[in-house]
């Protein structure tokens, strides 16, 4: 019975280690920066027959890597969204925005600071959205001003045609 228990524990530990390796390989293939060395620690525990510790470490390791991948995906989305917003701001509204800010996001990303990318990217995106909204509002006000000026010009011309001699050159 003790042998059966040990075999079951061994099998669960081996499965946990195998799953953690697969997840680690996926993270590595995506070039996600991961400085966690828990996998080698798990392998060491396994070689020492510490199967319970391997199982527990595997659960924690998998949870950390899953969270890391989630952060990485969110950081990718933020960078993409910010880049597209910058392109739109430049092409549709003529807004010139500092590319150094995008470079800063890329630097944080390459260093594996995905939380920093998310935090800074969301702030930059909000600021750029506000700038675009202000530009749209300014364009609308300019258009309204041009329309009122044209109406006034037409009124002045109409008065001039009717022989009104008052000065309408305001």
Annotate the PLM regions.
Residues 1-170:
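Long, charged/polar, soluble alpha-helical segments
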């Amino acid at each position: 019975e003790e042998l059966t228990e040990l075999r079951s524990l061994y099998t669960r530990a081996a499965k946990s280690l195998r799953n953690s390796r697969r997840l680690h390989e996926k993270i590595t293939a995506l070039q996600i920066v991961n400085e966690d060395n828990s996998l080698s620690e798990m392998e060491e525990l396994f070689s020492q027959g510490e199967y319970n510790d391997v199982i527990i470490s595997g659960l924690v390791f998998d949870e950390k890597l899953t969270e890391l991948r989630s952060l990485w995906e969110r950081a990718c989305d933020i960078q993409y969204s910010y880049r597209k917003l910058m392109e739109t701001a430049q092409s549709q509204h003529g807004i010139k925005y500092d590319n150094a800010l995008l470079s800063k996001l890329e630097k944080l990303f390459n260093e594996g600071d995905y939380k920093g990318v998310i935090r800074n990217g969301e702030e930059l995106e909000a600021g750029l959205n506000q700038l675009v909204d202000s530009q749209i509002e300014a364009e609308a006000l300019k258009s309204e001003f041009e329309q009122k000026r044209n109406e006034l010009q037409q009124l002045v011309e109409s008065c001039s045609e009717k022989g009104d001699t008052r000065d309408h050159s305001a």
